[in-house]
Amino acid sequence: MPEDRLVIWPAYFDLERSRGQGRRVATANAVRNPKLEDIIRASKDLGLDPVVETEKCYPKNWYEQPGRVLVLKKGSKTKTLRSIARALKKRRS
C-alpha cells in the first residue's frame, strides 16, 4: 500500500457498530449501513482521489461486505474520517 494513502473501511462509519466492532467516528456523525459507493462519492467531493479495492475484506468482519477505499493522506486519519463522515451525513439528509 502506498504511504501517501489512508485505508478507509465502511465499518468506520456504521452506526450499528460499536467502537469495539470497528466504528471510528462518533455516533452523531455515523450513518446506517454505509455503502462503498457513498464513501467514494464523499471522498471525491472532498478531493481525496479515492481508489477502490473491492476484493479486500475488513479483518474484524472478514465474512461480510467486502471492499475498502484508499484516499490521499491530507492530514491525520482522524480528521480525514471526520470529514468523510460529515460528507456522508450531508448526502443522506
Curated annotation (Swiss-Prot):
It is found in: Cytoplasm. PANTHER family: SIGNAL RECOGNITION PARTICLE 19 KD PROTEIN (PTHR17453), SIGNAL RECOGNITION PARTICLE 19 KDA PROTEIN (PTHR17453:SF0). It comes from Methanothrix thermoacetophila (strain DSM 6194 / JCM 14653 / NBRC 101360 / PT). InterPro entries: Signal_recog_particle_SRP19, SRP19-like_sf, SRP19_arc-type. The gene is srp19. SUPFAM superfamilies: SRP19. Keywords: Cytoplasm, Ribonucleoprotein, RNA-binding, Signal recognition particle. Its main location: cytoplasm. This is Signal recognition particle 19 kDa protein.
